[in-house]
A protein has these predicted regions:
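Beta1-alpha1 glycine-rich phosphate/pyrophosphate-binding loop at the start
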Residues: 1, 30-42, 47-52, 56, ...
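Ferredoxin-type iron-sulfur electron-transfer modules and their immediate structural context
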Residues: 1-114, 162, 167
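Core beta-strand elements of the Rossmann-like FAD/NAD(P) dinucleotide-binding domain
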Residues: 188-190
């Protein structure tokens, strides 16, 4: 569900910033949910995307396809509807793309180490991004004609449009070398 700015603000205002944020324990990537909810409530969208990116490589995907166990863990869920955390995450990343806040973070401290990542699914892309950001030269090897792995070939378009994968490829191509044309030559089908 895509939220307008006002709807996102209303959902963010519902977050109680619990002493023990059960929503965070429900989140598989440990997003700092109360913080970005508050930032959306105060309409500080730039800080909200910074907080979200501090724990989540690809909110473009999780904001659309995650089953949202954070919402099941939300304290409000006891006697009311949970905060719409997944929809807030979706709104944050969409606002970040609209304002060109999703940019490559090229490391200035190069290590000189070359690393190959086999496969460009979500795990491969996240590993490549993290390794590139600490200064390694990273090449992603992909046997298919386009990057994305399960994101591209396993998730139907009505769940997540593939344009989000293509946008990321353009932005992060300065961080990560795309070697999708390379194949393993020893006969191994990876």
């Amino acid at each position: 569900l895509h939220l307008t700015d006002d709807q996102a603000k209303q959902q963010g205002a519902r977050c109680m910033d619990c002493g023990i944020p059960f929503c965070m324990t429900g989140c598989p990537v440990n997003n700092i949910i109360p913080d970005f909810n508050d930032l959306v409530y105060t309409q500080d969208w730039k800080s909200a995307i910074d907080v979200l990116h501090s724990t989540n490589n690809f909110p473009e995907f999780t904001g659309r396809i995650c089953p949202a166990p954070c919402e099941a863990a939300c304290t409000l869920n006891i006697n009311d509807d949970a905060v719409g955390i997944k929809s807030i995450e979706h709104a944050i990343i969409d606002k970040a793309w609209e304002n060109n806040w999703v940019t490559p973070q090229v490391s200035t401290n190069k290590t000189g180490k070359n690393i190959a990542i086999v496969g460009s699914g979500p795990a491969g892309l996240a590993a490549a991004q993290q390794l590139a950001r600490v200064g390694h030269n990273v090449t992603v090897l992909e046997k298919s004609d386009r990057i994305g792995g399960l994101l591209r070939y396993g998730i139907p378009d009505f769940k997540m449009e593939k344009v989000h994968i293509d946008k990321l490829k353009v932005v992060y191509s300065s961080e990560i070398q795309d070697a999708s044309s390379l194949k393993m030559t020893d006969g191994t089908n990876y």
